[in-house]
A protein has these predicted regions:
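Hydrophobic targeting/anchoring helices
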Residues: 41-44, 51-52, 155, 217, ...
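The substrate-binding groove and active-site-proximal loops of carbohydrate-active enzymes
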Residues: 49-61, 117-135, 187-205, 232, ...
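Catalytic domains of carbohydrate-active enzymes, especially glycoside hydrolases
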Residues: 26-68, 72, 142-151, 252-257, ...
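Glycine-rich, aromatic-flanked loop segments that form ligand/cofactor-binding clefts
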Residues: 65-119, 150-161, 217-228
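Aromatic-lined carbohydrate-recognition surfaces of secreted/lumenal glycan-active proteins
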Residues: 25-33, 81-85, 153-157, 192-241, ...
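A conserved amphipathic helix/loop scaffold
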Residues: 465-661, 678-680
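Active-site-adjacent "subsite" loops/lids of carbohydrate-active enzymes
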Residues: 82-147, 181-199, 207
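Helical hinge/lid and interdomain linker segments adjacent to catalytic or ligand-binding clefts
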Residues: 42-43, 417-503, 548, 598-599, ...
């Protein structure tokens, strides 16, 4: 009886705090939290993704009900969305029998040694059974929609490659394949079959849950949007996790993604020029790129995530350096302008982390860093789309496939692909020389836009396989019309021989590439060399691309051919090598200078520049960026409507802006216990500056050349009233 009474009470509460079935929200910035509103985490994004009906299992704080948490954020003016995990979460009532009277801990993902893979205490990574999906729909999705939330984010559909040994997985195997389970470690074919099933299970899970959410929402007069926050294909492949990724973009029930890229994913080491090391900026650039290209042809919405810290405990200086690298990388994609500005603000603003790499002393976020971070995320609130392009020779794309995740673990027959070197071997030799390499997903080749901007397509089947033969028709048609294909590969990895479409049902090809080459009139095993097909060219290199980066200087021949194919065959112009990237986005200048590149020269940006990576917001006429560094600058010279008083850069968000003859005022909101700094553009030097009615004018804070006034004060989530008179 108590449980029934509790559920009825929640229903009444839900009715009382309905978020009025938000229609079109136009959310540009968002964040996720399992906490109720607190002054110290009120970062003023457009929306908040309230995490979990039962919260976040990693959050040990006193937990309010979902409805109470929703109400607390709604009262502060936020658009309310919902996020939870699809592979793990606060689902103990399911695992311990409260849902249907049966325990379900046996539905966790299990390794060869019989160990369950845990996300936390009593929180296993899940084999998503039909019963579990019913639980998610009934206990979670319904409750969220009943409160009036009309955007659902189901994050991290993850099946570990090392898993696949539980009884629940064996049952799913029998249902899917029609024959008994086979241990994945015993053969490449078993590994491939196991990975395909893992891929399918989360494809089915998201399709079922999202389809239900949309139908249930429709029954209540709501248009429910559904999104998948997910790591990139690059990261999941490197971390040996299987996830549906690109295939989800074609589902009508999927409205978009969050690209979960941050320091923790991008600092995963890779090889280049024979050296294994962290390359945070370069990896982040490729991660964001793989997420953009996954959805670009489909028109789905994409949020890019950055995190000012990471899951692994490090020091504040490390967090700052790598945050700047990932933040810059995301902004180099001018066609994306929606952002998750941070995950878990409670962890960022209130967590304790080391003060230096060599110290065990821990402190909360330093004021200078919280100020800088808030300046950066408020820039995201203003960040425009742009038709400007990133500098560098355009037109190189690396082909990717979801099956990249299928060959990572376990290895067979001694064939290794260290740190995803077969992928990085095609991308880093060019990216490190200032060429803005893009990625293309083989699953998207049916969209005519997929290869529209590609001049030279780089591909291999050493680390992935085509799941459908139709992709080869699309590639062949593209080459015939003038495209240039560089195929690198010995085609001797153990997955070439798995039972798949190229060697079954009337097909008898030794390798999938043999089928591709046949489409273009080539022999099944063309020797290394250059071949013509229609107006295009096929260049075959009988080397696995991992060898381009595993050895010092191993990319010389690849680069020679890439340049010749680009300039002579694709007729795309001179292939330019440099050590930097630069992009203009509206008022903003973005720059990144590479280490391990063609030179150690710095890159210089000139103009009237506000440095947004410096919490003092200094102004420069020239900003020098050294190798290994990045810059986010606001160029005052490009600001539209210079006679209009406006905040150019700020560690707060402005509301209630008003302008009159000789005055300008606004209310600044930002988290408590943080410091504000703002550069405000004014037509002339002010005579009066007030903060909450108190006069604070200081002539030394006026910068005549930029016509900006620098103002600083303590932040307040309730708002600080600022007024300028001149």
């Amino acid at each position: 009886m108590k449980q029934k009474h509790f559920l009825i009470s929640l229903t009444v509460l839900a009715i009382g705090i309905s978020v009025d079935a938000q229609t079109k929200d136009n959310v540009k910035t968002t964040f996720q939290t399992s906490r109720e509103w607190k002054p110290s985490i009120d970062n003023r994004a457009d929306a908040v993704m309230v995490y979990g009906v039962g919260g976040n299992p990693s959050d040990k704080s006193r937990k309010l009900s979902f409805e109470e948490r929703v109400k607390s954020w709604k009262e502060r003016g936020y658009i309310i969305h919902f996020m939870t995990g699809i592979a793990w979460g606060e689902y103990q009532d399911y695992f311990t029998g409260q849902w249907d009277g049966k325990w379900h801990l046996d539905e966790g993902q299990v390794t060869q040694t019989g160990d369950t893979i845990w996300h936390g205490h009593m929180v296993p990574y899940i084999v998503p059974s039909e019963n579990f999906l019913s639980y998610l729909k009934e206990r979670h999705v319904k409750r969220v929609i009943d409160v009036g939330v009309d955007a659902i984010f189901m994050e991290e559909p993850e099946f570990w490659a090392r898993a696949g040994y539980s009884d629940s997985f064996k049952k799913e195997w029998k249902k899917y394949y029609g024959f008994e389970w086979r241990p994945q470690h015993e053969s490449p074919e078993n590994t491939y079959l196991s990975s395909k099933l893992k891929y399918y299970l989360y494809y089915r899970a998201l399709n079922e849950v999202f389809t239900f959410a949309k139908e249930y929402g429709k029954s209540k007069g709501m248009d429910v949007k559904c999104y998948v926050p997910t790591h990139s294909l690059v990261n999941y492949s490197q971390w040996q996790i299987v996830s549906p990724e690109a295939s989800l973009a074609s589902l009508p029930c999927v409205d978009g993604y969050i690209a979960q890229v941050w320091t923790g994913t991008s600092r995963e080491p890779n090889f280049f020029d024979g050296r294994k090391r962290e390359r945070v900026f370069e990896t982040a650039y490729l991660e964001y790129g793989s997420m953009e290209s996954m959805t670009a042809p489909t028109g789905r919405k994409m949020f890019f995530l950055t995190d000012p810290i990471e899951d692994w405990p490090r020091d504040w200086a490390d967090y700052k350096k790598n945050y700047q690298a990932t933040f810059t990388a995301q902004l180099l994609y001018p066609n994306i302008a929606d952002y998750e500005v941070m995950p878990w603000p409670e962890r960022i603003y209130e967590g304790l982390y080391r003060t230096s790499a060599n110290s065990d002393k821990k402190e909360r976020i330093p004021r200078f860093y919280s100020t800088q971070m808030q300046v950066m995320i408020n820039a995201l609130n203003r960040m425009p789309l742009t038709d400007k392009e990133l500098t560098g020779s355009k037109g190189f794309s690396v082909l990717m496939a979801n099956s990249l995740m299928f060959q990572r673990f376990p290895t067979h027959n001694g064939y290794e692909d260290p740190q995803l070197a077969n992928f990085y071997g095609q991308a880093l030799p060019l990216l490190k020389r200032g060429v803005p390499v893009k990625t293309v997903h083989i699953e998207n080749l049916g969209y005519k836009e997929a290869l529209a901007d590609t001049k030279v397509l780089l591909m291999t089947y050493a680390n992935m396989k085509p799941l459908e033969p139709e992709a080869h028709s699309h590639i062949a048609d593209w080459v015939k019309k003038g495209g240039v294909l560089i195929y690198s590969g010995t085609d001797n990895d153990p997955f070439q021989n798995v039972r798949e479409w190229w060697n079954t049902n009337g097909h008898n090809y030794a390798t999938p590439s043999a089928h591709l080459f046949e489409q273009m009139g080539l022999p099944a095993w063309p020797n290394q060399g250059e071949y013509s097909y229609g107006k295009g060219t096929v260049c075959v290199i009988r080397t696995d691309p991992k060898d381009y980066v595993l050895h010092e200087g191993g990319d010389k021949y690849f680069l020679y051919l890439a340049a010749r194919m680009y300039e002579q065959n694709a007729k795309a112009g001179k292939l330019e090598f440099k050590n930097n990237f630069y992009l203009q986005r509206g008022d903003y200048d973005l720059a990144a200078v590479l280490e391990e590149s063609v030179s150690d020269e710095p890159f210089t940006v000139e103009g009237c520049l506000i440095d947004l990576f410096d919490p003092k917001l200094p102004i420069y006429t020239s900003k020098r960026i050294n190798p290994g560094e990045q810059a986010l600058l606001l160029n005052v010279e490009r600001v539209a409507g210079k006679k209009k008083p406006q905040v150019l850069a700020s560690a707060s968000r402005e509301e209630q802006e008003e302008r009159g003859k000789g005055w300008y005022s606004y209310v600044a909101k930002s988290p408590a216990e943080t410091s504000n700094v703002s550069r405000v553009l004014l037509p002339s030097c002010p005579k009066s500056v007030t903060v909450d009615g108190k006069e604070v004018f200081d002539t030394k804070r006026w910068h005549a050349a930029s016509h900006t006034y620098l103002i600083e004060f303590e932040n307040n989530p309730d708002g600080v009233s600022v007024k300028f008179c001149w």
